[in-house]
Structure formats: C-alpha cells, structure tokens
Amino acid sequence: KTAPEVVEAMLPYFTEYYGNPSSVYSFAAQNKEVITQQREIIANALGAKTEEIYFTAGGSESDNWALKATAEAYGNKGKHIITTKIEHHAILHSAEYLEKRGYEVTYLDVDEYGVVKLDDLKAAIRPDTILISVMFANNEIGTIQPIKEIGEIAHEHGILFHTDAVQAFGQVPINVDECHIDMLSASGHKLNGPKGIGFLYIRKGVKIRSFVHGGAQERKRRAGTENVPGIVGIGTATERAIRTMQERTKKETEVRDYLIKRVLYEIPYTRLNGQDRKSVV
C-alpha cells in the first residue's frame, strides 16, 4: 500500500498547491520546481542525469513508449527486436503490435531458474537488430537477470538496451551507466508509492520519439498536464525506498529464506520455481 509519509507528502498538492506547472504565473512556478526536485531524486537513485527522467502514467506506458517509439525512430536502421518469453504483457503485447506492422521479434527462452541464456542472446543478434528489451526482475518468480552482461552485449553490437525495472527499482541498487542501460521503466506503486505514476529513463542521445502528443510537457516528449501529486508521491517513495533498502532487504531475505526452507523440508514433492539468491524479495 502507499506509505503514510508518501500520502502526507502528496496531500497538499491536491488542494493547497494546485497550480498548473506548465503555466507562467508564480503559483505554477512553485509546482514546476517541485517536479524538478522529484526528478533529481529519481535520477540520483539511478546514477542518471535529471533531464533523462520522463514522468509517465505508469510502467505499462513506459514500456509501450520504449518499444514502439524506439522502433519507429530506428526503423530505418533495422526492424528486428529481441526480448524474452517471460516479459510483462506491456512488453509482449507491444512486441506483438510491432510484429503486425512489419517488425520481427525474437522471444528468448530462459533456463530452469528463469534466467536468460547469454549465448542464446548473442546468437539471436542480427545486423538489423535495433533493440533488446529484458526485464530486470521477473514479476512472478523474482529472478534477477544478468542485466550488466546483457547491456554489455547490446552495446558491443551497437544495439539499444531497455529494461523493465518495475519490480526492481527501489528494491535493489541500479546504476544505469554500470549496467549499460539506455532506457528503463519503473512504476510508483511497486515501491509503496501511488498508482498511476511512473517514469521512463531515456539516456541522453537516444533518438526516441514522442508517444503522447499535444503540449510541450516533459521536454516536448510526453504531452499532458503533469500529475503533480503523483510525481511528488513517486519521488517521496523513491527517497524512502533508497533510505530503507538495506534494512528491508535484510529482514525480507531472512523471512523468504525461512519460508522456502520450511516448505521444501516439510511438504513432499515441492520445488522452488526460480532462484533462491539472485531474486528480488
């Protein structure tokens, strides 16, 4: 659920501070500054630049934007995309959408632990591959993918790399430079923030096009009046998640390991679906 301190931070922006951040009057300028502050919090959490964070309505929009707009922008270079069979439907359905429009998509299998096989990834790369999209951590079994290695492979071949980090952001440390990530999707409600708010990290220099057209918000890349309460919510939730990450991880890992051990020991014919170590709790 939404953490009490997140709700408390959001409340004034429903009533007291209700100015439109895109307007020119002083009442609006205050909210514009608040949005910049939240953008900085998220950027710092990822080791990114402030101007590389774009607010959206959630993880699904971010995933759709990353795949569809990248395909459109780089379609003259190639029409081949690589992803996996265990992605969130926001990725899988976006991939299907692109297939119907002339793009080819390779769906990689995973091993018994839910991990992408790097040799399979390398074998799937073609001269016309423009994008690799692999989720950071699986939303069903929690398996964390070898993101850094995948990013290295992508960049060695001049391919853009996107990761759906909805299940991982705020749960495990992420540095976009160290992991060679070009685009990253995240959502507020997965880190005790509000629903209906997320963001897409887009590395500077990636020629991704606008997905929602209209106004000039989000540096002309995502139109629509900014959801100020939601943005304050995801910023506060991010700050809280980073601050408490070490303590939460220790406690939750102990509970997880205890549960797995008891179930495997006491219930016949059970097996663990996923990994017991490299996974989000």
Language-model region placement:
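Pyridoxal 5′-phosphate
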Residues: K1-V281
